[in-house]
Amino acid sequence: MNGGHIQLMIGPMFSGKSTELIRRVRRYQIAQYKCVTIKYSNDNRYGTGLWTHDKNNFEALEATKLCDVLESITDFSVIGIDEGQFFPDIVEFCERMANEGKIVIVAALDGTFQRKPFNNILNLIPLSEMVVKLTAVCMKCFKEASFSKRLGEETEIEIIGGNDMYQSVCRKCYIDS
């Protein structure tokens, strides 16, 4: 066995997906693995690099398609991918990297603000050795939150924002608002 595998962390906004991605990549760095992280280049909310909502920063390559960074990552054995739902080639890329013996760690939204599957991220589930569904805290009633609620009236799927544009909510608060 080549040791390659896929770890997938999914959940709503503000559930700690990016923080967990950074934690996992750091574990491998401590064990002397060569690690790289990749972020979606259109996500420039806080500046360059991978940022968490609580303003922790982590160095990252930027791309809109993962195939664009293939040549840059050949020497790395651990690949972290943030905002995986935005990459159109996420499934093919992760499968290829894992089959080549690389450890691939993906953080992604599983659902849109409309509670629909987010692009093809759910197609990674049957290919992943580990899947973790994280929850947030409902920003209305403070119960467990599994959904992301958009505050504005925009209808496009890809609108990148923070707590100025989205809330994490539980089922009841999603339906009630």
UniProtKB/Swiss-Prot annotation:
It catalyses: thymidine + ATP = dTMP + ADP + H(+). The active site is at residue 83. It is an enzyme of class 2 (transferase). It comes from the Viruses. GO terms for molecular function: ATP binding; metal ion binding; thymidine kinase activity. Homotetramer. Two molecules of substrate bind to each enzyme tetramer. Belongs to the thymidine kinase family. This is Thymidine kinase. The lineage of its organism: Viruses, Varidnaviria, Bamfordvirae, Nucleocytoviricota, Pokkesviricetes.
